[in-house]
Amino acid sequence: MGATGEQGFSSNDWERPVHQVTLSGNYIGQTEVTQELWLAVMGSNPSYYTSDSQLPVERVSWSNCQDFIEQLNQLTGKTFRLPTEAEWEFAARGGNMSQRYRYAGSNNVHDVAWFWSSIPSQQSGTPGYGTQPVATLAPNELGLYDMSGNVWEWCQDYSSDDQTNPTGPSWGTYRIFRGGSWSRSSECCRVAYRNYTYPSTSDDTMGFRLAL
């Protein structure tokens, strides 16, 4: 994990040092959770951009995601959860098939990410502004879509040391989110880029994907 050579310069020092983690097998969602799925589970849609059911759900806090996951698990009998940060970055990098790309699936950010300058229009209220339907750009090496861009993705926790199956501290003030969003620059779409905020934060750039 961390800012390996292909990531280039970053002012975000906490992407370093590069360190090794060991993960057990897990599953991660091919796409961000869509508004269609959220509505089916929760019965309402908190999102700001609602023109297409295949848009990622947004305006969801980390705590909202936990409520959704609890309800989904009751309905399905599964044990879905948010990915840990280590799981998220491993998947974004392409797992064991990684080609060491700067972004999730390419060194050309326009191939794989919806971000500020790639949105068809940057004027609020006009077509193309905001989130875009999932899986409309190229996937990464694992067949995962939008690991770079579209909406930020909440992680369960964070980690900083070499360890096996890191889940980060058991308590703290902030939660990690990764991947960049439609409202930010390509720099934020790098697979090593990290960010954090309060778990109560929600806006039209914040979404998530599931792990199992």
Residue ranges and their predicted role:
Residues 1-46, 148-149:
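A short glycine-rich, aromatic-capped structural motif
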Residues 197-199:
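Carbohydrate-recognition loop of C-type lectin domains
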Residues 202-212:
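Short, structured beta-strand segments at or near domain termini in extracellular proteins/domains
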Residues 17-19, 24-25, 130, 173, ...:
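A generic secondary-structure signal marking the coil-to-beta-strand transition
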Residues 10, 48-51, 56-195, 204:
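Functional-site microenvironments in short loops/helix caps that host divalent-cation chemistry
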